[in-house]
């Protein structure tokens, strides 16, 4: 029998995110892309088969960096591209691992970041130490500390996610939102916002409720839209339990389109939350809030808008139908997903 299929209609995020200025593509894209691709090729050849490497080319993660960070200088942009490539490779690898294997990988990452003399001979260790030395060692002390702390939390959360996946456990909405913020690695990419802008916010700014409100809104916007765009591939791999669409369907007892519509409405509210946080901080007298923190929130707007643009410019989520889906907003949900590729293929 042919596979059953259904369709969903995606929200028009372009309209929602039009409140954020479109600052276009970073002018250093071409040069930094070639350098970053050469760098990640040293590592993904160790674990990726030829088909997965071709898929990676079509995803064009370097384009993501150029859209997320349009203001970065060439060195900063290179760092963002390297990080996005690194995170993709780590995510694809751990998607196929058991909880024990994912926890072991997390241990390697943590040791590579925190112990200068650690070297277990693995490609993961080599990649992390190389990235840290090239980029994070040059960041401000607050940013560098947060980056290492956030990276260790991220890989630990990925290990926990592998355990939830094995048990087919679906979290409630509140728990999922907090958990997704950690498994998304967005704290790392947001740390690079400060690195690229040459701003090293003190921790008390991060702890400020208004800044935290804007920060969390930006994180959730990217998390929820990515979940929505990746749902088709994840359900095909049997990983849909760790996706906000599935979480909403279960928690609210609704069908898939109602869950998608809920995501769209919630993203409108999150957009307003980010804009409001910027407005409040702009009115403060202290420069660290009215200038530096505001600039960071504005850059988060670049990230949110750039993420939506890249999702349809790349074949990451919708394959060769990306441009058709962008126009029609219609996604056909099919199991099994015909062009799904294993990392070692």
UniProtKB/Swiss-Prot annotation:
(2E,6E)-farnesyl diphosphate binds at residues 316-317. The keyword Metal-binding applies. It holds the Pfam family Terpene_syn_C_2. The keyword Magnesium applies. Mg(2+) 2 binds at residue 91. Its cofactor is Mg(2+). Belongs to the terpene synthase family. This is Sesquiterpene synthase PILCRDRAFT_825684.
């Amino acid at each position: 029998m042919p596979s059953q299929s259904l369709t969903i209609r995606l929200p028009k995020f372009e309209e929602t995110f039009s409140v954020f200025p479109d600052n276009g593509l970073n002018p250093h894209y071409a040069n930094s892309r070639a350098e970053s691709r050469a760098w990640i090729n040293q590592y993904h050849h160790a674990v990726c088969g030829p088909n997965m490497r071709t898929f990676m080319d079509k995803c064009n993660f370097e384009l993501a960096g150029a859209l997320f960070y349009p203001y970065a200088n060439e060195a900063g942009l290179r760092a963002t591209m390297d990080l996005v490539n690194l995170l993709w490779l780590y995510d694809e690898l751990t998607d196929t691992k058991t909880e024990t294997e994912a926890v072991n990988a997390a241990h390697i990452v943590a040791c590579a970041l925190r112990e200068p003399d650690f070297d277990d001979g693995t490609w993961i260790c080599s990649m992390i130490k190389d990235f840290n030395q090239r980029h994070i060692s040059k960041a401000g002390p607050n940013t560098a500390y947060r980056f290492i702390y956030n990276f260790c939390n991220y890989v630990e959360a990925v290990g926990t996610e592998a355990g939830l996946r094995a048990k087919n456990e679906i979290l409630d909405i509140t728990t999922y939102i907090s958990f997704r913020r950690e498994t998304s690695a967005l704290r790392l990419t947001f740390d690079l916002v400060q690195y690229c802008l040459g701003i090293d916010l003190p921790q008390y700014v991060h702890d400020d409720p208004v800044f935290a409100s804007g920060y969390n809104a930006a994180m959730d916007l990217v998390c929820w839209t990515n979940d929505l765009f990746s749902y088709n591939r994840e359900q095909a791999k049997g990983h849909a339990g760790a996706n906000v669409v599935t979480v909403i369907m279960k928690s609210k007892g609704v069908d898939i389109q109602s869950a998608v519509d809920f995501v769209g409405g919630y993203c409108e509210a999150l957009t307003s939350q980010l804009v409001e946080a910027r407005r409040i901080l702009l009115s403060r007298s202290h420069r660290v809030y009215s200038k530096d923190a505001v600039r960071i929130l504005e850059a988060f707007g670049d990230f949110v808008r750039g993420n939506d643009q890249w999702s349809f410019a790349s074949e990451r989520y919708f394959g060769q139908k990306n441009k058709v889906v962008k126009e029609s907003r219609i996604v056909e949900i099919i199991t099994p997903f015909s062009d799904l590729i294993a990392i070692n293929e």
